Amino acid sequence: MVKLRLKRYGRKQQPSYRIVAMDSRSKRDGKAIEELGFYNPITNETRIDIAKILKRLKQGAQTTRTVKNILNEAQIIAKENS
């Protein structure tokens, strides 16, 4: 099953995350199928490729709780349901 989830990168004590599509059995920092965006919790900066996310959701990808919250904040989940 494909999941939309966060992949950590950055330095110690300064995490940044990429929003990626990955197989649910892969390690957190394993190989991603596709990069869909970026999230920095320190500066609360988010960059999302809406078209790619909607494409993956229509193909049946599931989201993790954190990614779902990020997408709700960006009002992308509402677009997907309409």
From Swiss-Prot:
Keywords: Chloroplast, Plastid, Ribonucleoprotein, Ribosomal protein. One of its GO terms (biological process) is mitochondrial translation. The keyword RNA-binding does not apply. It comes from Porphyra purpurea (Red seaweed). HAMAP family: Ribosomal_bS16. Belongs to the bacterial ribosomal protein bS16 family. InterPro entries: Ribosomal_bS16, Ribosomal_bS16_CS, Ribosomal_bS16_dom_sf. One of its GO terms (molecular function) is structural constituent of ribosome. PROSITE patterns: RIBOSOMAL_S16. This is Small ribosomal subunit protein bS16c. The keyword Ribonucleoprotein applies. One of its GO terms (cellular component) is small ribosomal subunit. It is found in: Plastid, Chloroplast.
